[in-house]
């Protein structure tokens, strides 16, 4: 999947979380972030902190790869 916007990241996180049958509360606790932060992330809010986003992605088994194409 190509990520171009914060909405793309949010959608990927939400879809993956649901596929893993995790609630927002469970994933937030696992990632040591607040549920409000996770909700904002899943809704594409552009002011999210990248470190927290990466923690959440790691706990979902996702990785971020950057290419210079």
Question: Each predicted region: which residue ranges?
Answer:
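A detector for short, charged/polar N-terminal pre-domain segments
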Residues: 1-8
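A generic secondary-structure micro-motif detector
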Residues: 3, 14, 42-43
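Short basic helix-loop element that most often maps to the first helix and adjoining turn
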Residues: 11-26, 30
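Residue-level recognition of specific faces of alpha-helices
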Residues: 12, 26, 37-40, 53
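Recognition helix of helix-turn-helix/homeodomain-like DNA-binding domains
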Residues: 32-46
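Short, conserved catalytic or interaction motifs in soluble domains
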Residues: 43, 68-69
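DNA major-groove recognition helix of helix-turn-helix/homeodomain DNA-binding modules
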Residues: 51-66
């Amino acid at each position: 999947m190509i990520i171009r916007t914060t909405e793309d990241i949010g959608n990927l996180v939400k879809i993956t979380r649901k596929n893993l049958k995790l609630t927002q509360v469970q994933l937030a606790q696992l990632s040591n972030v607040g549920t409000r932060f996770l909700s904002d992330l899943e809704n594409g809010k552009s002011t999210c902190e990248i470190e927290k986003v990466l923690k959440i992605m790691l706990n979902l088994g996702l990785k971020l790869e950057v290419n210079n194409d």
